[in-house]
Amino acid sequence: MIVPLALLSRGVVSAPAALAVLFGLTAADIARAASPEPVKSTSAVSTAAPSAAATSEQRYKARLDELIAPVLGLTPDPVDVQRLLDAIRLTGTKDQNGARALRAQITDPAARKLADWLAYRAGVGEAQDITRFVEANPAWPERNLMHRRAEDQLLATGGSTQRIKAFFNGAEPRSGAGYAALASAFLADGNQAEAKRLAGEAWRSHELPATFEKGFLERFGSFLSTVDHKRRFDRLLVDVSRSASDRTQRATTAARVVPLLSESDRKTAEARLAIYLRAKNAAALLAKVPAPADGKTDWGLAFQRAQHMRRTNQDEAAWKLLSTAPRDAALLVNPDEWWEERRSATYDALRLGKNEAAYALVADGTGLSVNPAKDQAFMAGWIALRLLKNPHAALPHLEASRTSADGPLSKARGEYWTGRALDALERNVEAKKRYDDAAKIVDSFHGQLARQKLSGGRSLDLRIGPPAMPTAEQVRRFVELDSVRAAVIATKAGLDRNIRVALFAHLRGHLETEADVAMLAHLAAALGDVQTSLRVGKTGIARGMNLIAYAYPVHPFPAYTPLRDPPEKAMLLAIARQETEFNHTIVSSAGARGLLQVMPITAQHICRDYKIKCDLPRLLTDNSYNATISSAYIGDRMAELRGSYVLGLVAYNAGPGRARQWIRELGDPREANVDPIDWIERIPIEETREYVKKVLSNVQIYRARLDEPNALRLEDDLMRRSDRR
């Protein structure tokens, strides 16, 4: 039987739209070179002779230049390049036969596969062809996306019920489109029970484009109950999105569900939408919500009530509601979003000195997924240990944060704080073991704290050698890998940088050995993409590899002319790494520009204060100029804050006003009676809290990269004050 799916396929993204969204492959983009234009360096600073460690790294990188030369020096056939560009152009049109013919004419296998991958990633091609490509090419990226694209195509093209069922081969679909396609097949074969199950799952749990909803409801609406509609509405609004555009998009989708709800739920839904969108009439609409006829709590409504209470400073009412909410996912719809709301309320409680209430909000982590669970366990343990002075209560939480850690940063944090709890219980041998394990993670804030804890607070040398040297066989496999070759071809053909970024992003997790990943990082740097090289290095470190040489590059930082006594170079490198990963072309959503993310108004103030010409376009094109402006700003803020690195970094990330506000609310981390480690953990804005820790950790590694003796002096940095240095 043939299933006519045209009615349902109106929401499937077209090939031109997909290409535009995914890679921005306009004609101008295709012609544009992938690497940024070189930037100017305006002044020289004398450099000391390289140390033995630096010389060893130089030799290592020179050797890798030789080893990867066969792929780095690859010169694509100009005819192939033109066919590739033309195929990409036609893929964004209705001439798919022409695009396929051009792809088939490309002689270089890697270039031809690149053209196929771009088409399949955009959802152009038969569903089975897309799936076969994914299964046959594990070294190629965006695999989950391509599976979803295949399901989009299956829905768009339809076919026999046998063909559709064979496509899934008994597995559950991955997308709303896939569930709809499979539900259609079962419905056509007369299996209404399975069609109802699949359609219900699509509606309750998956994204469905607006243009797709009408056809879906026409076909499956009779299978959906008001409970299903309520569940879809809850899934959309049990959410803590900080982006106004994200909230608007979700609310627009939710609003289309409102007419499908029961009469009583429609009134509640209007109030919930108003709260979610932070509308002025939210309180008035909330006051009109009728009590539930069955006396049961509507936990979707309760979530919006908690949001409204917190935003209108009804703190204790919000804490009570959030603390007493069940942990059953069936009731809460999304426990992780409830956790985010609980965490926000917890920082409000800490700010107000209500430590018991804060602990009650975070004490139970039932039902959370891995990331929220490890953060919940840490917060509960830290509050119990440091604020409630109850190490017995703290220890099981901190042990849970240690054992649930899924990456090096959370691992180091869990080990370090478990050690602190064991110390407080005078279980010193066990505490040392925890510090030892944390200290192995050398490029983490808590790992560095653990190292200094073990040394009695003394400053320490950090010696870091280059990665493992690849064997001849590893080199052969690397330079012949088609996705590696495709990245070079994409770069030299002038394709959009995001194509290369996607290839490297997948390969950095796919390649197996330290030497493999080092070659990948080296290749990215050799192609002029320091940011991608750095990200490859970060992933390598997270996988337990020594990729410090690439994850913490030194050479991209420019020589510059300081306007005042500058911050130490390690600090500037640390900030640049955190702000832009040395990609000087970045402009933030707030308008910050260039290497160190300078706001135009900041540049104008610095130019006025130091009586120099202000040239805002140079913030993006001249790294030396950007460093001159930003170093003066950083130096000025730190001087105002009496040399405090902690407060200086808060001011740079969140603004000087926030630094002064948090001194008033949380105490002064420069004073002896305030523990700066605890002070950082009480910063209520997650981005700033993590920024301070990461930049301070970066500083320690960069001192080592700059061959400074006693590079690890984090404890001194935490307590730094100009009047007591």
What is the predicted role of each segment?
Residues 30-80, 724:
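Compositionally biased, proline/threonine/alanine/serine-rich low-complexity intrinsically disordered stretches
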Residues 69-77, 100-110, 120-124, 132-142, ...:
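Solenoid-like repeat scaffolds
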Residues 83, 111, 116, 147-150, ...:
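TPR repeat positional signature
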Residues 88, 152, 184, 234, ...:
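Residue-level recognition of tetratricopeptide repeat
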Residues 93, 157-158, 189, 239, ...:
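Structural motif corresponding to the intra-repeat A-B loop/turn of tetratricopeptide repeats
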Residues 117-119, 131, 136, 314-317, ...:
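Catalytic glycan-binding domains that act on GlcNAc-containing polysaccharides
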Residues 119-121, 135, 147-155, 340-354, ...:
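Alpha-helical adaptor scaffolds
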